[in-house]
């Protein structure tokens, strides 16, 4: 755990004084994730406002929002992410009106967290399916061996009823969470 040199009241006062806030409704979070994906494709990590508007247009289309106001809503979303310190805006007097944007470490961390969660869910699902395959193979081998009622109950029935059924329930839950996230 981190050691903070400030007290709780000092940190609270500092956050209040600087007006720190994070608000990421689903649309804004999707926009941040889309920006992170675009950012990953750039060697220099720099994006133009036009790039961000194009990404927002895709998010807006996915959320089935009107296309007539997309430029203004994109501008509002960009300004919101800048205000929340998820994006940095760099302007130059030489290139007036052409700002360059970069994700901040906070923006990168938040997007990485959500992207990693999705990848973890996919990996977890793959592992669960592999375990089910092993359990089914073992139960099938035990069934081919034959044996008495105790053998069938212990090596075929019990693994299928408890182990495989439990894993299938877990797979179902993981898949539902992934579907909700998609």
UniProtKB/Swiss-Prot annotation:
Q: Name one GO biological process term.
A: chromosome segregation
The answer to keyword Transcription applying to this record is no
User: Where this protein primarily resides, as one coarse class?
Assistant: cytoplasm
Q: Which UniProt keywords apply?
A: Calcium, Cell cycle, Cell division, Chromosome partition, Cytoplasm, DNA condensation
Q: Which GO terms describe its cellular component?
A: cytoplasm; nucleoid
Any idea where this protein resides?
Cytoplasm, Nucleoid
Q: Which InterPro entries match?
A: MukF_M, MukF_M_sp, MukF_WHTH, WH-like_DNA-bd_sf, WH_DNA-bd_sf
- The answer to whether keyword Cell cycle applies is yes
Q: How does it assemble?
A: Interacts, and probably forms a ternary complex, with MukE and MukB via its C-terminal region. The complex formation is stimulated by calcium or magnesium. It is required for an interaction between MukE and MukB.
**Purpose:** Involved in chromosome condensation, segregation and cell cycle progression. May participate in facilitating chromosome segregation by condensation DNA from both sides of a centrally located replisome during cell division. Not required for mini-F plasmid partitioning. Probably acts via its interaction with MukB and MukE. Overexpression results in anucleate cells. It has a calcium binding activity.
Q: Which family does it belong to?
A: Belongs to the MukF family.
Protein name per its UniProtKB record: Chromosome partition protein MukF
Please state the gene responsible for encoding this protein.
Answer: mukF
